[in-house]
Regions:
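Conserved C-terminal structural/oligomerization subdomain of aldehyde/semialdehyde dehydrogenase
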Residues: 84-226
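ALDH superfamily catalytic-core signature
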Residues: 1-95, 117, 157, 219, ...
């Protein structure tokens, strides 16, 4: 999860935009993610040369404006001079919060909880169809439920990002997140134009398709239409 969220400082179109976590494992999971962030970027990520920059000042200001200080449980600091924002986790987020109203495209991970799988499924399906969905569960029935019945472009089970790293599978969105796929064979099909052609024989021409449309022609056509 930490890899997928903070790869390129969250500036990928398939970075997790929010984390929907079972309330029973919420505290444990957040603790593990915090540990991993510190392991990857250190205690002072703004000083880490391997930790990236936000692409420009306008984007920096937009992303920083999504941080609610009252909900920060990790990170939250920013340095405008270098266009860096710490890996940030917001906990106790609600669907009405500003950070849930748009694609983040930055190093902020909002965390929400659910009590049942029905609640989790409804939360996802009530929102615009995502480009990617990542399911973390060892239960095959849970995996299949979300893969089969929740609309999304593509994704992973127990991983993030890696579904677009292979040319053997198509990559693309669905509905609000786009239509069509590319990568591998899908690229060839998507960017090729298939021409539909009727090649009519010259030795026969069916006259009833031409005007005037006498009653016998209408009856003849109805035989095939109905």
């Amino acid at each position: 999860i930490a890899f997928g969220k903070w790869l390129n400082v969250g500036q990928t179109c398939v970075a997790p935009d929010y984390l929907l976590v079972d309330a029973r494992v919420h505290d444990e999971l957040l603790g593990l993610i915090k540990e991993e962030v510190r392991r990857m970027f250190g205690e002072h990520p703004l000083d880490n040369e391997d930790y990236g920059h936000i692409v420009n000042a306008k984007h920096f200001a937009r992303v920083r404006g999504l941080i609610d200080p009252d909900k920060v449980v990790l990170g939250g600091a920013a340095r405008e001079a270098s266009l860096k924002i710490e890996p940030t986790i917001l906990d106790g987020v609600t669907p009405e919060d500003a950070v849930m109203q748009e694609e983040i495209f930055g190093p902020i991970l909002p965390v929400l909880t659910f009590e049942s799988l029905d609640e989790a499924e409804a939360f996802i399906t009530d929102r615009p169809t995502p480009l990617a969905l990542y399911i973390f569960s060892q239960d095959r029935s849970v995996q299949q439920r979300f893969v089969r019945y929740v609309p999304f472009g593509g994704g992973c089970v127990n991983d993030t990002i890696m579904h677009l790293a292979t040319s053997h599978m198509g990559f693309g969105g669905m509905g609000a997140s786009g239509m069509g796929q590319y990568h591998g064979r899908e690229s060839f099909d998507t960017f090729s134009h298939k021409k539909s052609i009727v090649n009519k024989a010259t030795w026969l021409d069916v006259p009833f398709r031409y005007a005037p449309y006498a009653s016998w022609k209408r009856k003849f056509v109805r035989m095939f239409v109905h």
